[in-house]
Structures are given as structure tokens and as C-alpha cells.
């Protein structure tokens, strides 16, 4: 009646719950976008699409992000987050494109491209190891200037001579910038593209600090090459498409991925990234009982914060930020993203038997350079090799890790036990300034992976490939 209408119109409107809710709908949209490319656009029959998505992991991923956002998002001005988790083959096991699909269908894990910050540094260090350096190579952490660009560490703190392993763990910007100048920005880009980064990357000096934009999906999948022992892990979500009558229209074939890194280099990179979680900027990501490796990333003015890392079972990337690019309140990659990463990974690994990461978290170095040439891309493998060899999470079978080779015994083990009773940094031992093998830095213990001001805002400067200038310390240490 007229009276009922007036009464209803006088009441405040109520929002009905959206039918299309749940993070799995981000994946459903992704599948719909891919189908025309896989089977053509002339689709008339009902289809059955099999995917790699694990709904249990999907729910855990969505909960991990929303729990952190609900607790600290408003306080720290972080309104959005995304997560991607892949296995050793690149299969997408969980993907969350935002905090609420019903509110926003924009997929921040796939479509959005953001600067990765220091989460890009593993590609820099991989290029350096391929050039012949090792995790024990020494570089001077001190103020430097490359052209008109002067990269700085967080709060302008410097440690002097440090190993590359320490530089990775403490996310030292000056060392990463030096390495780009030595190996060349073009070589770093080649490594990133070889591992799976498909976005255009700018060949300038600041690439050392991750100033070129990438998607979380491609970044996470590129990290999976470290997790699986050096094979490309091209991300995929559709495994099979059939008609209602059973006719197969598409079948994924990921049985023989190319090798993209030398196994020795993978083992050393994994050892250095294990240090990030053991005693570096990613301490908040420690998973009780599991060995893990990864890298934090924070961009200019705290606009983006990321943590990407892996166990022997999964590789997961997490991003926090705002759609409008506004700054968060000092949120670093080792903060909210590392916490959400940890929460998800603990839930995802529940009930699985711990297994070490590839290489066991130990440095392989007999005082001689590790392999300098590009890996042999023709060496075949199978999806079964990858799953049985590097994806733990089942039976605790011993991996044929590189340090078991008699000719390549590591000279120095990294911290492999990351299980701690309390994640408070004060529980870690203090620096021993007289012990050169002590991984704990005296001045940069609490550093964050923050790039200096104006990174990427100055005119691009192409790094010049030039050899490292040996110092007396280099000669003494045999560098």
C-alpha cells in the first residue's frame, strides 16, 4: 500500500548480502578469462573445468589476510591485501585478490602491478652468484653514489665489510646497488625473466631495489624456482577442460619444465634467504618446526609491503597496501605481510611432516667460485621429480641435497633451526664483533627494507658493467 511504501522509504537502507562472495571468485574470474585462450571463444556446450585450487587452502589464505587487516589494518592505514600460493610446479593452490570480493572484484594478485621493493633482490644476488661470487664474498656496506643516485640503508646505518649472506638477511641497499653496477642491470633482468618475471623491467641502477612494477603472481611463481631446485614454475590454474559428455578440450602439460638455475646457485640462494627469516628482516615469518626462506620488500613512502617465501611444500607471496597508493603507517614487508604469511603457512602445513628446503639451508663454498655459466635449459625433469624431490609436506623423505656431495661440503652452515619459543627479537643472541662468522650484524640488526627517498623518481641511469675493485681486505680473504 501507499502507507507501506512511505514507511519503507523512511527507514535507512540495508545492504543485502552479495551472492558472489568469497575469495575463490577471484580465481573463477581468472579461469573465465583464460578459457577462450585455452579452448577458443566458440563455447556453446556446458563445460567442466578442473583447477589446481585447494579450497581448504583458499579459506585459510582469506582468513589469514582478513585477520591481520581486522586487527591492525585501520590503525596502520592498510586497507587491502592479496595472497598467492603455488606448489613446486607452479600450480596455484590458493589465490586471494583482495579483502572482500563482494566489495571489489579487482584482482590485486594478478592484475595489479606494484613495485616489489627489496623482494626483487634475490634476482640481483642470483646474477651475482652466476658471475662467480659466493654468499661469503665481501662487499663494503657504506654510502655510495651511482651517477646521480645515492642509495641509502634504512636510517642511514652502515656496517662496513659484510658477506653477501648478511647483506641479503639485513636487506642492505648499498650492497645490492653495488652488485647491479658490477653485473649490469641487463643481466639482472635476464635472470628475472628467465625465472618467470614477464613484466617489462627498466634497466637502470635502481632496479636493485625493485623499482620496476610486477604482479604478485609472477613474483611468487619466480620464487618457486628457488623452492623446487632451479626449474621454471610457470603459474597455472586450469588443469583440464571437458564437455558434459566427457570430451577433453584441454589438458595442462607441465611435465618437463626447463631448468633455469644451476642447483649449486639455488642452494646458496636458499641458504641466504633462510637467513632473512632466521635472523634478518623476516623474523616475523618463522614457522615453528619448518625450515623456510624468503625476502621482505617495502616500497617508497610505505606504499607497498610484501613478503614472499617458501618451505619445501609451498611458495607464498603476500602484499599489503592501498588501492589509491596512499602510504601506510610504517608498514614494512617484515611486518603485516610477514605475519599474514606466517599465519597462512602454519595453517597450510598443519599435519604435514617437515622437510628441509632445497640445499638444506647451508652454504656451499670451498673457497672456489660456484658455477658461473648459465644453467643448462635442456636438462629434462618431470613433474613427478619436482613433487617428490622438493615438495615435502608428506613423508619425511631425505632430499638429495647438494651438501651431501663429498666434493662440495659446505664450509659454514647457516642457521637451519628456525623454531623459536618467542618471536621477540630480544630472544636472539647479541652480536659478537670479534667473530667474523657470526651472522648477527652489530649495527643493522633491526634494519628494515626501506628504499631511500626519490628512488625511481630521478632520471634512469644505466649501470655500467665494471669489475669489482679489489681492496686489501679482498686479497686477504681471497676474493
Write out the residue ranges for each language-model feature.
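A generic secondary-structure signal for well-formed alpha-helical elements
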Residues: 1, 39, 127, 131-135, ...
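Non-catalytic, structured segments within soluble enzyme domains
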Residues: 1-59, 63, 96, 179, ...
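Soluble, non-transmembrane domains of envelope/secretory-pathway proteins that act on or interact
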Residues: 14, 147, 254, 292-479
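Conserved catalytic neighborhood of penicillin-recognizing serine enzymes
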Residues: 17-21, 33, 133-188, 232, ...
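A penicillin-recognizing enzyme superfamily signal
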Residues: 51-74, 83-85, 95, 100-106, ...
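Active-site rim segments in enzyme catalytic domains, especially the processed small/beta chain
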Residues: 107, 111-146, 150, 279, ...
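Mid-domain, small-residue-enriched loop/turn segments at the edges of structured enzyme/sensor domains
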Residues: 150-153, 184-221, 230, 234-237
Amino acid at each position: 500500500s501507499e502507507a507501506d511504501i512511505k514507511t519503507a522509504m523512511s527507514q535507512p537502507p540495508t545492504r543485502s548480502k552479495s551472492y558472489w562472495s568469497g575469495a575463490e571468485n577471484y580465481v573463477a574470474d581468472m579461469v573465465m578469462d583464460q578459457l577462450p585462450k585455452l579452448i577458443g571463444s566458440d563455447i556453446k556446450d556446458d563445460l567442466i573445468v578442473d583447477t589446481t585450487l585447494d579450497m581448504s587452502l583458499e579459506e585459510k589464505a582469506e582468513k589469514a589476510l582478513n585477520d591481520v587487516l581486522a586487527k591492525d589494518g585501520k590503525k596502520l592505514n592498510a586497507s587491502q591485501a592479496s595472497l598467492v600460493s603455488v606448489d613446486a610446479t607452479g600450480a596455484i593452490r590458493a589465490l586471494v585478490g583482495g579483502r572482500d570480493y563482494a566489495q571489489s572484484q579487482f584482482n590485486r594478485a594478478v592484475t595489479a602491478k606494484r613495485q616489489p621493493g627489496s623482494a626483487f633482490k634475490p634476482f640481483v644476488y642470483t646474477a651475482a652468484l652466476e658471475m662467480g661470487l659466493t654468499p661469503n664474498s665481501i662487499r663494503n656496506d657504506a654510502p655510495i653514489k651511482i651517477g646521480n643516485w645515492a642509495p641509502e640503508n634504512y636510517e642511514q646505518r652502515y656496517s662496513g665489510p659484510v658477506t653477501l649472506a648478511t647483506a641479503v638477511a639485513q636487506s642492505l641497499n648499498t650492497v645490492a646497488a653495488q652488485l647491479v653496477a658490477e653485473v649490469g642491470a641487463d643481466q639482472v633482468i635476464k635472470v628475472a625473466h628467465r625465472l618467470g618475471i614477464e613484466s617489462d623491467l627498466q634497466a637502470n641502477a635502481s632496479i636493485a631495489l625493485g623499482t620496476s612494477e610486477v604482479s604478485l603472481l609472477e613474483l611468487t611463481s619466480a620464487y618457486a624456482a628457488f623452492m623446487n631446485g632451479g626449474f621454471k614454475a610457470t603459474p597455472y590454474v586450469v588443469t583440464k577442460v571437458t564437455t558434459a559428455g566427457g570430451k577433453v578440450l584441454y589438458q595442462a602439460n607441465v611435465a618437463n619444465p626447463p631448468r633455469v638455475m644451476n642447483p649449486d646457485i639455488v642452494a646458496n640462494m636458499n641458504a641466504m634467504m633462510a637467513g632473512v627469516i632466521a635472523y634478518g628482516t623476516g623474523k616475523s615469518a618463522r614457522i615453528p618446526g619448518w625450515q623456510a626462506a624468503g625476502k621482505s620488500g617495502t616500497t617508497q613512502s610505505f606504499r607497498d609491503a610484501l613478503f614472499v617465501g617458501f618451505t619445501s611444500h609451498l611458495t607464498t607471496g603476500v602484499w599489503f597496501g592501498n588501492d589509491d597508493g596512499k602510504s601506510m603507517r610504517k608498514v614494512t614487508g617484515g611486518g603485516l605481510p610477514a605475519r599474514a604469511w606466517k599465519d597462512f603457512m602454519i595453517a597450510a602445513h598443519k599435519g604435514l611432516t617437515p622437510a628441509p628446503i632445497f640445499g638444506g639451508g647451508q652454504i656451499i663454498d670451498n673457497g672456489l667460485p660456484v658455477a658461473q655459466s648459465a644453467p643448462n635449459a635442456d636438462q629434462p625433469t618431470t613433474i613427478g621429480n619436482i613433487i617428490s624431490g622438493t615438495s615435502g609436506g608428506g613423508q619425511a623423505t631425505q632430499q638429495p641435497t647438494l651438501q651431501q656431495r663429498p666434493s662440495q661440503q659446505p664450509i659454514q652452515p647457516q642457521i637451519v633451526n628456525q623454531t623459536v619459543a618467542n618471536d621477540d627479537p630480544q630472544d636472539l643472541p647479541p652480536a659478537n664483533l670479534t667473530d667474523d662468522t657470526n651472522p648477527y650484524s652489530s649495527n643493522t640488526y633491526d634494519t628494515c627494507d626501506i628504499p631511500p627517498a626519490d628512488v625511481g623518481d630521478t632520471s634512469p641511469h644505466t649501470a655500467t658493467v665494471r669489475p669489482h675493485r679489489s681492496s686489501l681486505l679482498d686479497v686477504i680473504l681471497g676474493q
